[in-house]
């Protein structure tokens, strides 16, 4: 088996470099077995950490083909590229975890006479946050770390763990705010790379933000947003006649009816960028789909949940569920990644919720004509990790793009209330994404999120198209 390992000795090297090694290992060998073989048979100077060899200590975390993994658990493949985590480097695959550890709080019981009794219910609530093995893969992958003062997912997870512990006497909410609580974009990359799949955004970040809101510690922009939603039922002020004002309650398809669905438009596509939603209706009509649009639908509540203003959520949920139940639909389509993720994960709906790309890829769609240009696709975090949808939009895009150049996923910085609350941080995160876009050589970016569309246009200067709008271009070209 051949592997490529990133090497760096600060005493002799001016910069890191890659070296290729060929070793003999058993079938099913782990990356750690390969590193051992290189160390024991080829180069004893190779530096790497390990201890338990059972996925419990976290010390052997490295990057394999660009993604964090525990070397003792990741099966080795021929051609693997092994690098250190994206943390300050000491030597070879060894990184400095001291700064990350320094950000973590520890139990503060005060006087032993003040200690509270821990109940079984307390333990159950804390348990998911105790699974952390401190591998720091999450910090290595977090887009907000380095772009702000954010202490990172591990530190915030620990803040909530201690906040839930009745024995702890410190003010963990105020500490969390000081450690950059509102800098998290809730992209869920930390969950994706966590060996224990700890839901830090939902079980720590959003919980602490809700407590911060009750304490008056939220960001001014988030307060204004919450007030707007409570007073109007919408998270954005209208710039033109809204989508719901322009369309009829039922949009009949061209030809045979293949399916009947409800459509949840979301605030951005309703009042700020209406045309992509209108384009989506034309695409659905073209593909034999009857669309029912309840006019009583309101904001899904995603901006409130992500920023901690959860008090108004039950009313929004009730109004939206009732709107579609009364419409008598079994499936509700969304075209905003954030709305779709919220309806799927934060609601308990009696109907199915599906993204428009998910639905079209599932039932089949008419092939459009190819549209000129080179296109790349940006995965919205709330679609990729919030709904586990990745291939479906690419299927649609490849059907219409003259040339498609793929791009690895990375948060653009617009989510989690960061774009509205801390725009400077959002711009820094976006600048990294902009460089990735530049490397593709694409003329256009395509995505399925209005917030990503706005932000990517700002940081790249490129035209950003919604997949529905691009497909409609292809259909119109086909009809010429």
Outline where the language-model segments fall.
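Short cysteine clusters
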Residues: 52, 57-60, 72, 132-138, ...
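Active-site phosphate-binding and catalytic loops of NTP-dependent enzymes
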Residues: 43-49
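Iron-sulfur cluster-binding electron-transfer modules in prokaryotic oxidoreductases
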Residues: 1-25, 200-480
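Extracellular beta-sheet/turn segments enriched in Thr/Pro/Gly and aliphatic residues
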Residues: 80-84
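Short strand-turn-strand beta-turns centered on an Asx-Gly dipeptide
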Residues: 24, 63-66
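Short, structural beta-strand-to-alpha-helix junction motif
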Residues: 28-34, 75, 242
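Ferredoxin-type iron-sulfur electron-transfer modules in oxidoreductases and energy-metabolism complexes
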Residues: 29-41, 86, 90-233, 315, ...
């Amino acid at each position: 088996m051949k592997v490529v390992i990133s090497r760096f000795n600060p005493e002799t090297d001016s910069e890191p470099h890659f070296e290729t090694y060929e070793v003999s290992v058993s079938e099913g060998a782990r990356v750690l077995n390969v590193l051992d073989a290189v160390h024991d048979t080829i180069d004893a100077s190779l530096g790497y950490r390990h201890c338990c060899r059972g996925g419990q200590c976290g010390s052997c975390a490295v990057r394999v083909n660009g993604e964090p993994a525990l070397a003792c658990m990741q099966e080795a493949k021929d051609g693997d590229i092994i690098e250190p985590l994206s943390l300050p480097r000491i030597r070879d695959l060894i990184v400095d975890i001291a700064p990350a550890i320094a950000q973590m709080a520890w139990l503060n019981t005060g006087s032993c006479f003040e200690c509270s009794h821990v109940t079984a219910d307390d333990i159950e609530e804390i348990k998911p946050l105790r699974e952390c093995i401190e591998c720091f893969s999450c910090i290595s992958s977090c887009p907000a770390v380095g772009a702000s003062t954010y202490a990172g997912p591990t530190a915030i997870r620990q803040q909530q763990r201690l906040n839930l512990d009745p024995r702890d006497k410190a003010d963990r909410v105020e500490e969390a705010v000081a450690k950059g609580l509102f800098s998290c974009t809730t992209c869920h990359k930390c969950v994706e790379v966590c060996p224990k799949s700890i839901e830090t955004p939902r079980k720590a970040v959003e919980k602490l933000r809700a407590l911060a809101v009750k304490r008056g510690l939220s960001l001014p922009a988030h307060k204004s947003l919450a007030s707007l939603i409570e007073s109007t039922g919408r998270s954005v002020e209208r710039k033109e006649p809204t989508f719901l004002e322009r369309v009829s309650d039922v949009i009949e398809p061209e030809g045979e009816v293949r399916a009947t669905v409800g459509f949840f438009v979301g605030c951005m596509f309703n009042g700020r960028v209406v045309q992509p939603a209108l384009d989506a209706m034309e695409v659905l009509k073209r593909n034999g789909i009857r669309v029912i649009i309840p006019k009583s639908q309101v904001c899904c509540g995603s901006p409130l949940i992500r920023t901690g203003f959860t008090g108004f959520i039950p009313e929004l949920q009730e109004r939206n569920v009732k709107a579609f139940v009364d419409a008598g639909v079994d499936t509700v389509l969304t075209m905003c990644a954030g709305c779709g993720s919220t309806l799927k994960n934060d609601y308990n709906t009696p109907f199915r919720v599906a993204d428009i790309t998910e639905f079209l890829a599932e039932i089949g769609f008419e092939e459009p004509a190819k549209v000129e240009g080179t296109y790349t696709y940006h995965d919205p975090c709330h679609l990729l990790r919030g709904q586990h949808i990745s291939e479906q939009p690419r299927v649609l895009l490849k059907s219409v793009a003259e040339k498609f150049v793929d791009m690895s996923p990375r948060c653009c910085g617009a989510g989690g209330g960061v774009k509205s609350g801390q725009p400077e941080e959002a711009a820094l995160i976006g600048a990294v994404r902009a460089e990735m876009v530049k490397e593709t050589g694409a003329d256009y970016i395509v995505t399925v999120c209005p917030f990503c569309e706005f932000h990517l246009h700002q940081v790249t200067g490129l035209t950003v198209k919604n997949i529905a709008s691009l497909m409609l271009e292809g259909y119109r070209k086909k009809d010429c």
